[in-house]
């Protein structure tokens, strides 16, 4: 019985830990409803290629919350990174700060380009 209880508790912990993650989509998106495209990777990653017109807002930058303060919290934003993880983290921070517009997780650069129809700008 103890082993069963440990499995149940571990499963519940995993479910609650993953519940805050924001999934990214592979379905095409109507970009007309988004105010801005935000790349939350590092400047070095951004320099290797980014969506045309994307604004760099490094989620790992200590000033990330201050950068978010320059945005309209009621607007819709399309957010992407390298894998979808950091864009999900950025979205969670934005929600915690009171952002009420649609916050779309574009996932990785290639997926974000595919679903948005925006070209990747290469160096």
What positions do the PLM features span?
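Active-site flanking residues adjacent to catalytic metal/cofactor-binding acidic residues
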Residues: 38
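Rhodanese-like catalytic fold shared by cysteine-dependent sulfurtransferases
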Residues: 2-10, 16-35, 43-75, 85-123
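Short, surface-exposed ligand- or partner-binding patches at beta-edge/loop junctions that are enriched
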Residues: 80
């Amino acid at each position: 019985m103890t082993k069963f209880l440990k499995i149940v508790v571990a499963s519940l912990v995993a479910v609650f830990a993953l519940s805050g993650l924001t999934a990214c989509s592979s379905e095409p998106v109507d970009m007309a409803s988004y105010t801005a495209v935000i790349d939350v990777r590092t400047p070095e990653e951004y320099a290797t290629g980014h969506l045309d017109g994307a604004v760099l807002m490094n989620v790992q930058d200590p000033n990330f919350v201050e950068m978010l303060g320059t945005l309209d919290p009621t607007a819709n934003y399309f957010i992407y990174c390298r894998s979808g993880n950091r864009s999900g983290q950025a979205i969670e921070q934005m929600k915690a700060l009171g952002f009420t517009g649609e916050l779309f997780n574009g996932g990785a650069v290639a997926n974000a380009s595919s679903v948005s129809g925006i070209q990747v700008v290469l160096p």
